[in-house]
UniProtKB/Swiss-Prot annotation:
The keyword RNA-binding applies. It comes from the Bacteria. The keyword Phosphoprotein does not apply. Its main location: cytoplasm. One of its GO terms (cellular component) is cytosol. This is SsrA-binding protein. InterPro entries: SmpB (IPR023620), SsrA-bd_prot (IPR000037), SsrA-bd_prot_CS (IPR020081). Pfam families: SmpB. The gene is smpB. Keywords: Cytoplasm, RNA-binding. It is found in: Cytoplasm.
Length: 162
């Protein structure tokens, strides 16, 4: 019998917002769909997207991704206007929208986009409920990371000697 070839699953992440992990404490992570136009999907497939300064707002009980820059391709049709920074609607359940709007309003959280990824043929957004870090928090994080790297180096040296 012929065996089916097992294919390696490639990373489906399109772009990761590393700045968000540096500037915010991420409390909880959510996934949502995006309402996109055809030219936006083509631009995302070619990698012309930037989410480093993007955030999520609540407008009339609907969530929108703001300040996400999707550059239009040169070969796009001129029949319609391409607004690179338009608000993109997030597809979330009603209870998720209520939970997020309550957290944002009462406790001072913000919603920051973390990454864009493909799920089958759909483009999805991963965003987090976050609180801002102070300069002191950032320094503490940096010291922890440096100490972890130093520990790994020490362990590596001790393994080589034995």
């Amino acid at each position: 019998m012929l065996q089916k070839k097992k294919y390696q699953k490639k990373s489906s992440k399109i772009i990761i917002n590393k700045k968000a992990y540096y500037n915010y404490f991420i409390e909880k992570v959510f996934q949502s769909g995006l309402v996109l136009e055809g030219w936006e999907i083509k631009s995302i497939r070619s990698g012309k997207v930037n989410i480093s300064e993007s955030y999520i707002i609540n407008d009339r009980n609907e969530m929108y991704l703001c300040n996400c820059l999707i550059e239009p391709l040169q070969m796009s049709s001129n029949r319609f206007s391409c607004d690179p920074t338009r608000k993109k609607k997030l597809l979330l359940h009603k209870n998720e929208i209520d939970f997020l709007s309550l957290k944002k309003k009462n406790t001072g959280y913000t919603m920051v986009s973390l990454s864009l990824f493909w799920k089958k043929s759909w483009c999805k957004l991963e965003f987090g409920l976050a609180k801002g870090k102070t300069a002191q928090d950032k320094r503490i994080n940096l010291k922890k990371r440096e100490w972890e790297q130093e520990k790994l180096k020490i362990l590596k040296k001790t393994k080589e000697t034995y």
